[in-house]
Amino acid sequence: MESPDEKWFRERLRHFLEIRHPPRQFHHVMIERRSRLAFESYAQSVELGVPAASAVRAADKVLFRGLLFSKYDTVHLILTTDFPAIPENQRQEIALRLVRICAPIFRAYDLKDDFSERPEFRQLKEELRTGIRSWIDENGVPGYHSPARKEKPPVPYSEHPRYPKRNKRK
């Protein structure tokens, strides 16, 4: 294994945030601080004689602390499993919007790194499913037809308004 440096930790964190916490991927100060602290943790561990793989695991705890549970991931997973007809290229944008819309639901829970392993996680997912389904039924999603959404039926062509023909200029 190549010996990690601060840049290595920075790139790992940046990639992790891009996938699991898209809004945080541009928090450069946080990324710099965490990658520096993770590298320092790694270097101290190696200096004490800890094997490199164990030193990386210790540094990862510093690098990813407080980031292991992802609201975005949870919402995106629900969209993927419960609404597979929503086009893939729209899911990220919709998930980002729904994370903000579902903020009151998330606030009711103590979301720590191990939250997805606790029994309350199942309850959170059910509340989110209900909230997301309700939002989609009310607002719609381009490219996805919700069975519960009351959409106006398309107007037959014969009933379209007729516009008078324009006089051609000579």
Which residues are covered by each model-predicted region?
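C-terminal alpha-helical interaction appendages
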Residues: M1-K170
